[in-house]
From Swiss-Prot:
Main localization of the protein described in the UniProt heading: cytoplasm
Name by which UniProt lists this protein: Gamma-glutamyl phosphate reductase
Alphabetical list of SUPFAM superfamilies matching this protein: ALDH-like
Family listed: Belongs to the gamma-glutamyl phosphate reductase family.
The protein's role, per its UniProt record: Catalyzes the NADPH-dependent reduction of L-glutamate 5-phosphate into L-glutamate 5-semialdehyde and phosphate. The product spontaneously undergoes cyclization to form 1-pyrroline-5-carboxylate.
GO molecular function: glutamate-5-semialdehyde dehydrogenase activity; NADP binding
Amino acid sequence: MKDMDSVSAMMSQIGQRAKEAAASLGFASVERKHAALISAAEHIWTQRAAILEANAKDIAYGRDKGLSDAMMDRLLLDEERLRGIVTSLRSVAEQADPVGEVIAAWDQPTGLHIERVRTPLGVIGVIYESRPNVTVDAGALCLKAGNAVILRGGSESFHSSKALHACLVQGLRDANLPEAAIQLVPTRDRAAVSEMLTMTDTIDVIVPRGGKGLVGLVQREARVPVFAHLEGIVHIYIDAAADAEKTLKVVMNAKTRRTGICGAAECLLIHKDVMPTLGADVIKELMRAGVEVRGDETLSAIQGVVKATADDWGREYLDMIVAARVVDDIDDAMAHIRTHGSNHTDCILTEDARAARRFMTELDSAIVMHNASTQFADGGEFGMGAEIGIATGKMHARGPVGAAQLTSFKYLVSGDGTTRA
């Protein structure tokens, strides 16, 4: 009980500090926010040896816990990935500042001039699992949008997140911004998550970033509004009019480039007319690359294909595994996606413009692609600098959540002694 009380008191203090920081951060100048992000990027690069040392502790911890290869890949930092984090941070710094942007403006016959302008959300709570880079992405995007943020990373990335967070705080300090603008929960105790979900007085929105278990827990127990980032059950439909060269290139990239990210392809749907030719070539190429293919009855006749079970449809592997089945036509493909998908990202490979238009119009996923790798389902690749997650719900934000999506708006109404009749 005493431990629970101490966690509750700690989270209450963190929440109060965040609320106070948010009050001043909402009016912080563009120049100060830019300076804080650029400075943080410089500190990360300067302190990369210490950050990699901290990450080595997390890797050892993850190995002892028996984490899967996919989870270990998400956890791993090296110099190249740190360079990517620094580049992303600088990119966010250079983005247009969304705060104060006039979204719409109009005049009423009554003489009123009305503007709808972007405003910060306030305090954002981000709960995530093993990826240490989320510490930087979430901190940077929230700061850019004038929000304070409370970060609760996974126990596996505890040391890495701490080291990266210290660089973000140094950036805030250098720019004379409140250090409480970006806070990291300093404990692995899971009670901190439960506390965050009920902090309605200090947290304005919660963003869960992780697997089905984490997101489900947050959606069930949160009393604070939630931006849901569901698992990426990503489908690629190979149409009868697909180009062979493009298809092979896109499928291989979508599945094998990085299997542990939410935009990795998890299920292939192959039109029956191209199954004996292009479909078979794709399956064999995947297996040659070391991918385990779990196929339906038709595909399991190909040597090396494992027969799929009911559990393989609608599953996020995050590994060198893909489910695959033959479909009768585009309607059959879309029906499968509606049944087993997660409204994250889905793709059609075709040269038939009409089929592409139907697929992109009729499917209701947050991101729908045509002839492009699903690994592009990423805020950085969308020109947002970074993302805090891919929102799969329909309220407020959808798709990659960048700085602009971390704002609300208010109406500024001006008159000249104007009264209502």
